[in-house]
């Protein structure tokens, strides 16, 4: 089976969130199952550097409204920069890049400039990537390889299924099956309808029975409407987005497509996130050597300017600082956290008001609250190794990876019962302690008092070190790798090909 992944980011080259981790790990896990999975990325400078002496395969025409020359399709393995190491793209995964400097040779992050302002031509940039993927699917890569399935991810590649569908309607050509994964329904890629022709979209597509959404072109909706199969990143989130509370106006479409929608949990790169071999933490350990975490805790306190002799757990946050992530609730609960003898370490950036509130908390509580306003991959590893409790009180969370990293490292996750958090963390109760399934602390509904009560339960268990270590060992023993998820995707691909074949007869 031949599968082409197409996405806007991939760790370690470009990362703004968990999408990059998934795109880096899942193709390699699928190749372990004998699936010829390959990856297409925008030709950002780090991607082109990783390709090194890439093979130019073919020229690609521009979109009608692009205003720039067409791009080139390059191929390689993504390891030519010599940076293969923890987390680098598996060399077994063939990598394609769309070399289009006018769109992708920029500073800043993939979607915005250095000041955080979205690039005004984002729709054309990522539509160009989607068009390149569709062309590979319809015509091949120039070396005789053509995918049977194209797996697109989030709004940036939502036009891939649409381009495939329209090309097949226009020419009668056989097209590959399209699979579209929703990593976060909140980000929808809404653009003005005046761009319809510029994006090479037919007039009839601008309809409620198409990609129109409240008077705009919905790039995410295009993927939801035109893809053959839909997935999202946890079973619970797949159910949540079919209701108005978390459907962001698309719940009706998702209910209509419920038979084509699957929730498949993300996994963790077990090579990258392994406390027994992690080069980024002060001391390596496993579930039989939990005392080695003390060195990581001491180093973590030093990094965040925290006191060395607390009377309670060291709580931590590794997150975008946003309302969705419940950071405001953490700050509201801070007086109770401190009254429990706890400390708080926060790593992240995001909403400026929340950043300022966190900075004020650090100023008001020196030695008890620490803040690093950055995205720092190495420091995130050290937090997982040194924290007692990882706080993830999200209002919604499609899957979440940070709580799975916490399980792996023995930092007990304290999470809201939403999305993938509900699917990956088992609450500490008498029954779960008795049967060995307890792995953390889960609260509902999302709100201040439920969060505080969960903090109180965590602090109480922390004062019972034997039980605490038991739950840590439970957490570290949970299978959070990609193998099971990859098997689910492989089954989905086979079913999608079978269904499409039957429909075409």
From Swiss-Prot:
* Signal peptide boundaries: none
Gene Ontology MF terms: alpha-1,4-glucan glucosyltransferase (ADP-glucose donor) activity; alpha-1,4-glucan glucosyltransferase (UDP-glucose donor) activity
Keyword set, alphabetical order = Glycogen biosynthesis, Glycosyltransferase, Transferase
The enzyme's main class, written as a single word, is transferase
- Gene Ontology biological process terms, A to Z: glycogen biosynthetic process
User: What's the catalysed reaction?
Assistant: [(1->4)-alpha-D-glucosyl](n) + ADP-alpha-D-glucose = [(1->4)-alpha-D-glucosyl](n+1) + ADP + H(+)
Q: Which Pfam families match?
A: Glyco_transf_5, Glycos_transf_1
Any idea of its EC number? 2.4.1.21
Pathway the protein contributes to: Glycan biosynthesis; glycogen biosynthesis
- CDD domains linked to this entry: GT5_Glycogen_synthase_DULL1-like
**Source taxon at top rank:** Bacteria
Instruction: Please provide, in alphabetical order, the Gene Ontology terms of the cellular component aspect for this entry.
Output: cytosol
Presence of the UniProt keyword Cell membrane in the record:
no
Instruction: Kindly give the InterPro entries that the UniProt entry links to this protein.
Output: Glyco_trans_1, GS/SS, Starch_synth_cat_dom
* Annotated NCBIfam families: glgA, PRK00654.1-2
The protein depicted here goes by the name Glycogen synthase
């Amino acid at each position: 089976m031949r599968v082409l992944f197409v996405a806007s980011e991939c760790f370690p080259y470009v990362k703004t969130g968990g999408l990059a981790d998934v795109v880096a790990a899942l193709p390699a896990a699928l190749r372990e199952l004998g699936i010829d999975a390959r990856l297409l990325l925008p030709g950002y400078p780090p991607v082109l550097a990783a390709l090194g002496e890439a093979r130019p395969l073919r020229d690609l025409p521009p979109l009608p409204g692009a205003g720039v020359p067409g791009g080139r399709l390059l191929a390689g393995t993504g390891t030519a920069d010599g940076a293969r190491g923890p987390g680098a793209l598996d060399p077994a995964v063939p990598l394609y890049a769309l070399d289009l400097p006018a769109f992708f040779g920029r500073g800043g992050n993939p979607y915005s400039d250095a000041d955080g302002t979205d690039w005004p031509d984002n729709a054309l940039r990522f539509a160009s990537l989607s068009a390149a993927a569709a062309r590979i699917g319809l015509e091949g890569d120039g070396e005789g390889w053509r995918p049977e399935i194209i797996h697109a991810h989030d709004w940036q590649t939502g036009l891939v299924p649409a381009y495939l569908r329209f090309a097949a309607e226009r020419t009668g050509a056989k097209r590959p099956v399209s699979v579209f994964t929703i990593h976060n329904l909140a980000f929808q890629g809404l653009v003005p309808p005046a761009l319809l022709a510029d994006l090479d979209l037919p007039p009839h597509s601008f309809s409620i029975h198409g990609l129109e959404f409240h008077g705009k072109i919905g790039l995410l909706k295009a993927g939801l409407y035109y893809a053959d199969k839909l997935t999202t990143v946890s079973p619970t989130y797949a159910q949540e987005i079919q209701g108005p509370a978390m459907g962001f106006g698309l719940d009706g479409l998702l209910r209509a497509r419920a038979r084509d929608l699957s929730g498949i949990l993300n996994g963790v790169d077990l090579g990258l996130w392994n406390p027994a071999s992690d080069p980024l933490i002060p001391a390596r350990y496993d579930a039989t050597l939990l005392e080695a975490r003390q060195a990581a805790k001491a180093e973590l306190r030093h990094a965040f300017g925290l006191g060395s002799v607390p009377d309670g757990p060291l709580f931590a946050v590794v997150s975008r600082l946003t309302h969705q992530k419940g950071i405001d609730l953490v700050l509201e609960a801070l007086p109770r956290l401190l009254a429990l003898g706890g400390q708080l370490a926060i790593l992240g950036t995001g909403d400026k008001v929340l950043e300022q509130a966190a900075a004020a908390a650090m100023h008001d509580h020196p030695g008890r609250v620490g803040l690093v306003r950055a995205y720092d991959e190495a420091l995130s590893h050290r937090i997982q190794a040194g924290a007692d409790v990882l706080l993830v009180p999200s209002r919604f969370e499609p899957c979440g990876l940070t709580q799975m990293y916490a399980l792996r490292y023995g930092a007990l996750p304290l999470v809201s019962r939403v999305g993938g958090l509900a699917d990956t963390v088992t609450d500490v109760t008498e029954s779960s302690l008795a049967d060995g399934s307890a792995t953390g602390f889960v609260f509902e509904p999302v709100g201040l008092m439920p969060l505080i009560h969960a903090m109180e339960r965590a602090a109480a268990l922390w004062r019972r070190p034997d039980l605490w270590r038991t739950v840590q060992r439970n957490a570290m023993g949970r299978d959070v790798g990609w193998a099971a998820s990859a098997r689910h995707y492989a089954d989905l691909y086979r079913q999608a090909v079978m269904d499409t074949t039957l429909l075409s007869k």
